[in-house]
């Protein structure tokens, strides 16, 4: 039995009509618009519908994915073959202290002209050079390991060194200076050269000056630790701070302060009487000797003042302290009995009446003083002369005021 045929799909014309219908619905009323935005929107809708609902930028995404795939392949090839990268040296670093990367791969073609080093032993010198070992000492070079050639070389060297100055255990000053200034390392060379007879190693237990400064520096302690340390040093047999102990302490401190001020003032008085004026203010000088104020007659611009002797009254400056007892105060409190302490209800009216009577009496006394005899009024006015200003108009006309102004 032959297989069933697949149901026939819609024809191309039907699909095209549907797309045109969708475009017409989405752009209804926008075809006659001449704006740039409307026209772009219409074109975008047409492209989307004609493409079957897929965004036209999907092709661009495929190209982007292909490009990223190629870059990933290139990175994978680079990680496999590891090509030599250009070396970069920090500022201030000697290039000869760095091994050439091309030389390690066997690709350097510059030879002696290369600015980097072709000595592979430099990589073994990465470890920090010890300051307590002299590199010229050969401890492992024992006589048991020598052959005839080595023995002959040592003998010749021994006899040749006898002509030199004898060696010593004194440390080289250039070496110490380089160590103190942190300049000692694999590439440091002594100014005396390889023939330097002094030691280039520190003796065991030697402490540098810079380390001594760090040790001598006192350890800083925080404020909290200091307070806790002082509290622990006080011990347990201490007076507990209460209101009574605080008031007693405050009273004692005030008395000590007052006694100190009195003693200081007495000392200054004694010094002033002996002619010593150092540490004495001007106010204290005038208080000790008020006669200094009256130094002559008053001149123009001076201020007038009175001179009097100041009396010291210790009773005014006395401090009295009274301890409050809440229990005694609560026992002494009682309710108001109302006997002799309640104001009358008409006290305000009585006060107003008394004030009115007093004001009326004062007004009557004042009127009697101003008018002692009302029957005989005073007539102190001078007689008036009627002919005083008769010829005044003619005199004013004769005045030549314009000429004077000119």
Swiss-Prot record:
Q: Which family does it belong to?
A: Belongs to the ZC3H15/TMA46 family.
Q: Which UniProt keywords apply?
A: Coiled coil, Metal-binding, Repeat, Zinc, Zinc-finger
What segments bear the compositional bias annotation Low complexity?
Answer: 1-11, 38-50, 352-364, 372-382
Q: Biased composition, Basic and acidic residues: where in the chain?
A: 12-28, 56-70
Question: Pfam families from the entry?
Answer: DFRP_C, zf-CCCH
Q: Name one GO molecular function term.
A: mRNA binding
Q: Which organism is it from?
A: Drosophila pseudoobscura pseudoobscura (Fruit fly)
Protein name according to UniProt: Zinc finger CCCH domain-containing protein 15 homolog
GO biological process terms on file: cytoplasmic translation
Query: For the region Disordered, what residue ranges are annotated?
Result: 1-70, 336-382
The terms describing its cellular component in GO are: cytosol
Superkingdom, taxonomy of origin = Eukaryota
Q: Which residues form a coiled coil?
A: 57-82
- Annotated C3H1-type zinc fingers sit at 94-121, 166-203
């Amino acid at each position: 039995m032959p297989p069933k045929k697949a149901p026939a799909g819609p024809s191309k014309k039907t699909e095209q009509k549907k797309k045109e219908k969708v475009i017409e619905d989405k752009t209804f009323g926008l075809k006659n618009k001449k704006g740039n935005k409307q026209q772009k929107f219409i074109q975008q809708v047409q492209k989307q519908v004609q493409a079957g609902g897929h965004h036209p930028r999907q092709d661009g995404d495929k190209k982007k994915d292909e490009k990223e795939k190629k870059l990933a392949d290139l990175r994978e090839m680079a990680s496999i073959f590891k090509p030599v990268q250009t070396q970069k040296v920090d500022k201030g670093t000697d290039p000869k202290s760095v091994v050439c990367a091309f030389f390690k791969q066997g690709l350097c073609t510059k030879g002696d002209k290369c600015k980097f080093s072709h000595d592979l032993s430099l990589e073994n010198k990465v470890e920090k050079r010890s300051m307590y070992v002299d590199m010229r000492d050969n401890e492992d070079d024992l006589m048991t390991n020598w052959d005839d050639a080595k023995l002959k070389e040592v003998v010749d060297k021994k006899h040749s060194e006898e002509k030199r100055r004898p060696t010593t255990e004194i440390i080289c000053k250039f070496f110490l200076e380089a160590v103190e200034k942190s300049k000692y390392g694999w590439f440091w060379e002594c100014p005396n050269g390889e023939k330097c007879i002094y030691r280039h190693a520190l003796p065991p237990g030697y402490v540098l000056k810079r380390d001594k400064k760090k040790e001598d520096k006192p350890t800083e302690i925080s404020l909290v630790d200091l307070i806790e340390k002082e509290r622990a040093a006080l011990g347990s047999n201490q007076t507990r701070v209460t209101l009574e102990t605080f008031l007693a302490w405050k009273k004692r401190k005030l008395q000590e302060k007052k006694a100190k001020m009195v003693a200081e003032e007495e000392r200054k008085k004694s010094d002033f009487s002996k002619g010593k004026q150092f540490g004495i203010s001007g106010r204290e000088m005038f208080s000790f000797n008020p006669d200094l104020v009256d130094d002559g007659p008053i001149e123009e611009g001076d201020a007038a003042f009175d001179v009097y002797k100041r009396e010291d009254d210790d009773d005014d400056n006395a401090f009295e302290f009274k301890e409050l007892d809440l229990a005694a105060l609560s026992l002494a409190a009682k309710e108001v009995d109302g006997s002799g302490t309640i104001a009358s209800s008409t006290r305000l009216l009585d006060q107003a009446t008394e004030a009115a009577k007093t004001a009326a009496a004062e007004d009557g006394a004042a009127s009697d003083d101003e008018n002692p005899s009302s029957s005989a009024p005073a007539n102190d006015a001078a007689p008036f002369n009627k002919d005083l200003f008769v010829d005044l108009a003619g005199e004013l006309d004769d005045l030549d005021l314009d000429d004077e102004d000119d």
